[in-house]
Amino acid sequence: MAKIQKIKGVADLFPEDSARYAFMEKTARDVFSSYGYGELRVPILEKTELFCRSIGEETDVVQKEMYTFPDRKGRSLTMRPEATAGIVRAYVENKIYQPGKVSKFFTFGPMFRYERPQAGRMRQFHQIDAEIFGAAEPQADAEVLLMLSSFLSNIGLEKLSFELNSLGCPECRPKYNQALKDFLASLDREQLCDDCQRRMDTNPLRVLDCKSKNCKALTENAPTLPDHLCGECREHFDTVIALIDEAGLQYTLNPRLVRGLDYYQRTAFEVTSGDIGAQTAVAGGGRYDGLVESLGGPKKVPAIGFACGMERLAMLLEGEFEPAADFYVALVDERAAKDSLIFGEKLRRSGLKGEVGFTAKSMKAQLRHANKINAQKCFIFGAEEFENGTVTIKDMAEGGEQETVSRDEYFK
């Protein structure tokens, strides 16, 4: 019978890989909780309308990348391509909003997009996501950036680049959009890729987000958003910059940074690395003050957040992440199988972590496995130990000592 293999674009995460993800999740919990964030878990499946209304009908995500299907009652459902929309939906549906109330959430989990699989880009991928609602002040933008920086630093990633821009607001964006349309109209339309030709009519800002080298070259002299900001947006962005300058965060202003989702306005940012190939962005986010209202919530609820791609971060992490075992119980004589199993259970009940050998093997093979799991100590059950009610304890450090003691005395 033929083997059943995993589908294209997904991965099996074995213990050595899962340990990296667990390390990132634990670090995120520790860092985010220190800023007052609480964990929120939202469904993987949502109504398709949620993403059409939030991400934008004309975005590549909605047009080409979502896993969407009808359920048995004909309702259109989508496996979430990102986390923010689901968190906003939960925020609105559960009426968490109150005047003056600031709410902070984080979440982890798998997301799904139908993309061409490559290093750092999978069809099922994992994100760490953080969002804050109810804070319009630039201090919130600065705190989000500093919290993201703290998380990345705490997982050992220092050589990353922060890029920032302001995308304006509904007051100043239309003037910029017109200036951009006028510029794009001056280009030879046929020289742009098919996607950008479509975007010129539906969402001109997305042209600046194109990854095609040819499109980037053609739009190199396009007008920039920072040159078209209204007074309030300029003041907001200048204050954000002043705050992160004071905090010592290193960054670069990138006037071409627009992000790939329609809901962003004002502050937008990306974190990039030059060490993971073509997919350089490892995190990104921004402010989305109009999204709560567009999903049925009250008007003018400010919000800002970010997401980190765990697959891409995992590619940058160095070192071993599987925790060392406290012990390994080596079964050398089959007669001691019951005694060794019970001894290992007592060790675990005392707060230690480790394994018990189920099959009698040579001492050499047992020690090899103890070294493989980085056990601190090896408890040996051979013929002599079985007959005398003892256990031999070997310190697995190089040149470690070995001693034989009574099993009954060991736990006293």
UniProtKB/Swiss-Prot annotation:
Task: Tell me the NCBIfam families matching this sequence.
Answer: hisS (TIGR00442)
> Protein name, please?
Histidine--tRNA ligase
Kindly indicate whether the keyword Aminoacyl-tRNA synthetase belongs to this entry. yes
Q: Which family does it belong to?
A: Belongs to the class-II aminoacyl-tRNA synthetase family.
Q: Does the keyword NADP apply?
A: no
Q: Which GO terms describe its cellular component?
A: cytoplasm
User: What PROSITE patterns does this protein map onto?
Assistant: AA_TRNA_LIGASE_II (PS50862)
> Looking at its record, which EC class is this enzyme?
ligase
Pfam family for this entry, one: HGTP_anticodon
Main localisation, per the record? cytoplasm
Fill in the subunit field for this protein.
Homodimer.
Q: Which GO terms describe its molecular function?
A: ATP binding; histidine-tRNA ligase activity
Instruction: Name the InterPro entries for this protein.
Output: aa-tRNA-synth_II, aa-tRNA-synth_II/BPL/LPL, Anticodon-bd, Anticodon-bd_dom_sf, His-tRNA-ligase, HisRS-like_core, HisRS/HisZ
Subcellular location per UniProt equals:
Cytoplasm
**Which species expresses this protein natively?**
Maridesulfovibrio salexigens (strain ATCC 14822 / DSM 2638 / NCIMB 8403 / VKM B-1763)
Q: Which domain of life is it from?
A: Bacteria
Report the EC number(s), separated by commas if there are several: 6.1.1.21
Task: Name one process (GO BP) from the record.
Answer: histidyl-tRNA aminoacylation
UniProt catalytic activity: tRNA(His) + L-histidine + ATP = L-histidyl-tRNA(His) + AMP + diphosphate + H(+)
Q: Which UniProt keywords apply?
A: Aminoacyl-tRNA synthetase, ATP-binding, Cytoplasm, Ligase, Nucleotide-binding, Protein biosynthesis
